């Protein structure tokens, strides 16, 4: 098998500029994801008063410890219903991704009732359709954590 060669020059100015720009974008993305977590966590007192776990705590307890969880669609609904980039909360009131439960790779879908009481939006519908299509193609079981 032939070895792949690269023309990327990590020491070049253009590479360094591109890398710096990309890292800034990743930091911004992560700050938007954190906005979603913070918005959900504002309801922690309500969950505790009801004797409930938060959506992320339920997810954490479901997943196999030490195994990866690949979250998907974390930017769904961003600036859709609320066009203000400074206050819009991404995520479409759901946490979805692929993780391992009892050693089995699964699609996990958690309704995040900490955001807008878990109300489904049009974007939530797009997310659910997308992940269910992935599950069919990849033959993944689905676990849906619902709070009603």
What positions do the PLM features span?
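Terminal-region recognition feature
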Residues: 1-148
């Amino acid at each position: 098998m032939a070895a792949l060669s690269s023309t990327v020059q990590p020491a070049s100015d253009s590479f360094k500029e591109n890398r710096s720009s990309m890292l800034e974008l990743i930091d911004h993305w992560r700050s938007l994801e954190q906005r979603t977590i913070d918005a959900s966590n504002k309801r922690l007192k309500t969950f505790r008063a009801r004797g409930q776990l938060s959506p992320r705590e339920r997810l954490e307890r479901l997943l196999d410890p030490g195994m990866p969880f690949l979250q998907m669609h974390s930017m769904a609904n961003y600036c859709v219903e609320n066009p203000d980039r400074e206050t819009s909360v991404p995520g479409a009131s759901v946490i979805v991704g692929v993780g391992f439960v009892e050693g089995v790779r699964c699609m996990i879908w958690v309704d995040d009732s900490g955001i807008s009481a878990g109300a489904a939006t049009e974007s939530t519908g797009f997310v659910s359709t997308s992940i269910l299509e992935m599950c069919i193609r990849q033959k993944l079981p689905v676990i849906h954590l619902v709070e009603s």
